[in-house]
C-alpha cells in the first residue's frame, strides 16, 4: 500500500471539490505534513497558488483575496502552531463575512498526546469562530470517494459567510510512490471529473426580504446610515437616498461619496441633533461604523422604526434598537424597495455639513499633517484603482475629515479592528483585482506586519504604501489614558524610520516634507509603476489633538 500516493489522491479530490464551489485562489505556507495538499494544489489547473513564509500573514493575504474577489479562498498550512497563526484572519472573516477555507494538515491520531513532534490537538482549536468545522479521517481507500466529495459539498453549502476549518490528518510517508496507484478509487466518481459542478448540489432557502409596509414608511421622515458595503452598493444607495429626500450619513467604508461630509464633526452640533431627532425611521445599511459621534447618535436615536440591512446574519447593532434585522445584500433590498421622489426634509444638515467641510479646509489649508493627509486623501487616489485603509487613528481621521469618491473601492479590516495583518490584507486585495492600489496605515501597524512587504513587492500594478509615522499608537491620545503612563504603556513609541525596511524588500522609498511633495511623489508612482513605501513623519499627538479641536470648533459654528 502506497500511503503517500493515496494521501495525494485524497487531497486532489478535496481541492477539486472546493474548486467546484468557486475557490480559485489558494494560499500556501511551507511545511512537510501539508505536502499532499500542496502538491495537489500545484497540480490543479483551476487554482492560482500564492505562497508566504508567515502563516499569520498568509491568513490575512487570503482574507484580502476573499474581500476583493468576493469568492471563497483556501489556505494550506502544516500542523502545530502554524495552524494557530490563522486565528486572527479567521476571526476577522467571521465578523466581516469573507469566506475562508482553512486546510490544516495534521498528524494522524496515534501521534497526538504522546510527545510526537509538531503534534497538537487541532480539531476544535478555533472554538466557535469557524462557521463550519470538519475533522476528516486519516485517508484510506476504505472510505468511498463520494463520501469525501459530498462531505466537502455539504460544508460549502453551509458556508454563507466566515470560515470553514477542515482538519486533514496525513500519515507518513508523504513523498514518492507510483502515481498510478489507486486510480480506480478516483474513477468511481465517473464523469464528474469532466464536469464543472459539485457532486452534491444543495439549494439555499431564499430569505423573505420584502417589507410589506415599505410604501407607508417611504413617505415618512427617514435617515439613512451607510456602513460597510461594496462600491456598487454604496453608489446605488447614495442615488436611492437622494431620490427619497432622506439625509445619508456615510461611513468611510460606505463608498457612497459621503454626501454629507465631515459627519463625525457636525453630528456634535446641537442644531444638527435637533433636526435628526425628527426622524421617524432610520435605515442602516451595513455595519462596522467608525465615527465616535455617529456611534453616539446611533445609540441615542429613538425613531419609531429602526431597520438594519446587511447580508451577514446576527444583531450587528450594539445599541439594541427595537426594529427589524433584515438579512439581505444591500443591492437586492434596494431593488425590491424603490424610492419615491420627495423633497428633502432635512436640508439644514447640508448647511452644517458644508460649514464643517469649509472650516476643516480653512484649518488645514497650510498644514502638512496627519489630519491634512486624511482630509486630502482623495487627491492621491489612482484612477481606476482602489484604497486600503488601516485601523486605529488614521481611519478615524479619514472618516471625520475626508470625502472619498462615490463608488470608489475601499477595503479595510473593521470587523475586529486589529492592526495585525493589514499589509498582508492589502496585498491580497491588490492580487485579487490587479488594480493600482493605495494603502495607508500607521507606523505600529506597519511594524506589526513588516514581513508582508515581501508580499507587496509582488504587486502586479502600481502600489503605494503610505506609512503615517506619528511614533506610536497615538489613538490613545484621544482616550483618557493616564498621562504619566500614556507613552510607555499605551502609545509605545518605537523611534523608527522605514527607509531601510523598504530597501531590504527592494521597494521604492520617499519621505516628502510638504503636501505638494507628497502629491507629486504619489503621482510619479502611478506613472512609474512598481511598489513604493512613502513615509510621512508627523508630530506624535498632533492628529489626535487636531481632531478634538475641530469637533469642538464645529459644534460651536
UniProtKB/Swiss-Prot annotation:
It catalyses: isochorismate + 2-oxoglutarate + H(+) = 5-enolpyruvoyl-6-hydroxy-2-succinyl-cyclohex-3-ene-1-carboxylate + CO2. Its cofactor is Mg(2+); Mn(2+); thiamine diphosphate. GO terms for molecular function: 2-succinyl-5-enolpyruvyl-6-hydroxy-3-cyclohexene-1-carboxylic-acid synthase activity; magnesium ion binding; manganese ion binding; thiamine pyrophosphate binding. InterPro entries: DHS-like_NAD/FAD-binding_dom, MenaQ_synth_MenD, MenD_middle, THDP-binding, Thiamin_PyroP_enz_TPP-bd_dom, TPP_enzyme_TPP-bd. Pathway: Quinol/quinone metabolism; 1,4-dihydroxy-2-naphthoate biosynthesis; 1,4-dihydroxy-2-naphthoate from chorismate: step 2/7; Quinol/quinone metabolism; menaquinone biosynthesis. It comes from the Bacteria. Keywords: Magnesium, Manganese, Menaquinone biosynthesis, Metal-binding, Thiamine pyrophosphate, Transferase. Catalyzes the thiamine diphosphate-dependent decarboxylation of 2-oxoglutarate and the subsequent addition of the resulting succinic semialdehyde-thiamine pyrophosphate anion to isochorismate to yield 2-succinyl-5-enolpyruvyl-6-hydroxy-3-cyclohexene-1-carboxylate (SEPHCHC). Homodimer. NCBIfam families: menD. This is 2-succinyl-5-enolpyruvyl-6-hydroxy-3-cyclohexene-1-carboxylate synthase. It comes from Yersinia enterocolitica serotype O:8 / biotype 1B (strain NCTC 13174 / 8081). The gene is menD.
